[in-house]
From Swiss-Prot:
Protein name: Phosphoglucosamine mutase
One Pfam family cited in the UniProt record for this chain: PGM_PMM_III
Known function: Catalyzes the conversion of glucosamine-6-phosphate to glucosamine-1-phosphate.
GO biological process: carbohydrate metabolic process; peptidoglycan biosynthetic process; UDP-N-acetylglucosamine biosynthetic process
Positions annotated as active site in the UniProt record: 102
Location of Phosphoserine modifications: 102
Record-listed Mg(2+) binding positions: 102, 243, 245, 247
NCBIfam families on file: glmM (TIGR01455), PRK10887.1 (NF008139)
GO molecular function, one term: phosphomannomutase activity
Annotated family: Belongs to the phosphohexose mutase family.
Source species, domain of life: Bacteria
Annotated source species: Brucella abortus (strain 2308)
Lineage summary: Bacteria, Pseudomonadati, Pseudomonadota, Alphaproteobacteria, Hyphomicrobiales
Keyword entries, A-Z: Isomerase, Magnesium, Metal-binding, Phosphoprotein
Length: 451
């Protein structure tokens, strides 16, 4: 069934434009409140947000919807996405909401929903919400005496800081480690530096002064150049780059080299397998993860299960098949021993634990495999279904033949933007580049002709 509001990670779009309007946000609150409200009992929602200016507007609209449906609301303020999932369980809430567009620019925003178990909602529930939003909302309103209330929660970030710190083994501290943290002017700007400092690290923080419009602006995990320079400038042992809602992380080693999610998963998988902590006989990643990771794991008799792009699909596969490590190349790392969703801070702490335990520099710890040449390009589309076009399909089939058994080709529409993502990888770099560029050219020409 076609989805009108929900993408791969909740509802997302430009703030104050469809579907990210106060009206839609209020209807989401009403629909979700009705679905998760416990009849005859007090029910509650927890609502967090990142640092975007439009978060105030959407927060108030969601509160109106939830309270109209008879739910009480706990307002968490600016806080990481994984903290909302954790506090949803800790505060015995019936639903959790994070207002964020993750790594997108400030003018975008989104709504992510978590069930009472802290996991993102299923496709079926999201479709139910969509159907309710499109219909008459009157039947979902609470009676006069059952309208909900809202209150701010004090000390919520400190609960999360303590939770994150407890994931570092008690016999390990970060004493002697100089760490630069890029907070992306986002939701992790208070919690990440505090947690690292309390664990003993010398912390240098950058991009920790959010003003509502500078979130992800030339900073964070999608723009690590500033962090690379700072690590070199202060001679740090490691740099940690979060994104706007702190659910993803990339590292920078002491030489200023970026370490992506594939390498981080390799470190954790190898370490946890050696200590008999790894479950499922391997890890879960998406179709975008590098072939080098798959080969690295296979050499250690570990498997790589692949899913569609989106950490929700990674988590679903982990739960269904008994894995406890999964993630994405982009830096969403899911460690189900600790969390129900990607957690940038906790993932970084596990890597630092390995480095401290082995007494090795980050560059030695995190260079687990040589990535296979991989190229990802995006082409903007003007509507329609370009992947069903005859010329585009023919170009894709031809590309697969050229790559043969020595590479992979992944072509998919973005779940959050009007883009087609084209990724190829293989041992022959020149062939990979030619394959991607040829497909991009065909999609561009056919999309322009259709417009």
């Amino acid at each position: 069934m076609t989805r009108k509001f929900f993408g791969t990670d909740g509802i997302r779009g430009q703030a104050n434009s469809f579907p990210m309007t106060p009206e839609i946000a209020m209807k989401v609150g009403m629909a979700v409140g009705y679905i998760f409200r416990r009849k005859g009992q007090a029910s509650r929602a927890v609502v967090g947000k990142d640092t975007r200016r439009s978060g105030y507007m959407l927060e108030k609209a969601l509160v109106a919807g939830f309270t109209a449906a008879g739910m009480d609301v706990f307002l968490l303020g600016p806080i990481p996405t994984p903290a909302v999932a954790m506090l949803c369980r800790s505060l015995r809430a019936d639903i959790g909401v994070m207002i964020s567009a993750s790594h997108n620019p400030f003018y975008d925003n989104g709504i992510k929903l978590f069930g009472p178990d802290g996991f993102k909602l299923s496709d079926q529930i999201e479709l139910q919400i969509e159907a309710m939003i499109e219909g008459d909302m009157t039947p979902f309103l609470a009676s006069h005496g059952d309208v909900g209330r809202a209150k701010r929660v004090d000390g919520d970030i400190y609960r999360y800081i303590e939770f994150a710190k407890r994931t570092l083994p008690r016999n390990i501290s970060l004493n002697g480690l100089r760490v630069v943290v890029d907070c992306a002017n986002g939701a992790g700007y208070k919690v990440a530096p505090a947690a690292l400092w309390e664990l003993g690290a010398e912390v240098i923080t950058i991009n920790n002064e959010p003003n509502g419009i500078n979130i992800n602006e030339d900073c964070g995990s999608t723009h690590p150049i500033g962090l690379m320079k700072k690590v070199h400038e202060v001679r740090a042992d490691v740099g940690i780059a979060l994104d706007g809602d702190a659910d993803r992380v990339l590292l920078v080693d002491e030489n200023g080299t970026v370490i992506d999610g594939d390498q981080l998963m390799a470190v954790i998988a190898e370490s946890w397998a050696a200590s008999n902590r790894l479950e499922g006989g391997g890890i879960v990643a998406t179709v975008m993860s590098n072939l080098g990771l798959e080969r690295f794991l296979a050499d250690r008799n570990l498997t790589l299960a692949r899913t569609k792009v989106g950490d929700r699909y990674v988590v679903e596969h982990m739960r269904e098949h008994g894995f406890n490590v999964g993630g994405e190349q982009s830096g969403h790392i899911v460690l189900s021993d600790f969390a129900t969703t990607g957690d940038g801070l906790i993932s970084a702490l596990q890597i630092l634990a390995v480095a401290q335990e082995q007494n090795k520099p980050i560059s030695d710890v995190c260079r687990k495999f040589q990535p296979v040449p991989q190229l990802l390009k995006n082409v903007r589309t003007t509507g329609g279904k370009p992947l069903e076009n005859k010329r585009v399909k023919s170009a894709i089939d031809e590309a697969k033949e050229r790559l043969g058994g020595q590479g992979r080709l992944v072509i998919r529409p973005s779940g959050t933007e009007p883009l087609i993502r084209v990724m190829a990888e293989g041992d022959d770099r020149g062939l990979v580049e030619k394959v991607v560029n040829d497909i991009i050219d065909v999609i561009s020409s056919e999309s322009s002709a259709a417009a």
